[in-house]
Amino acid sequence: MRTLFRKQLDRFFSTSKAFRELRTLFERPETRISVSGPRGTFLPLLIGELHGHRKAVSLVVTPTEREAENVQQDLEGFTDAGVALFPWWGTAAYEGASPSASLFGDRVHVLSRLLTGEPLLVVAPL
């Protein structure tokens, strides 16, 4: 079932002029792209497909922590690329509260993965 679905998606992405233009932009390392319109799991599918043509780190920014977690889970299902959630700090800078040790560790782990040069997909909430 997944193979048939994947073949149809590959056909769509290979014949879509809009996708080819978007991929050309995405392959430029200095380019920032804002994608709006796709809903549900199509957005992570599109992001995973675009990232598959790039040999660099990609940053996906979401409005909320929950949406970041959903996008991360979807990306892990749609792509073979490494996907990492860079969690929200949990406090505002002016609050003076410290984040938990596990949260700090999760963030440091993502930062250490970035240092390896792996073409990672990092998902982070605002």
Regions found by a protein language model. Name each.
Residues 1-126:
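ASCE RecA-like P-loop NTPase motor cores
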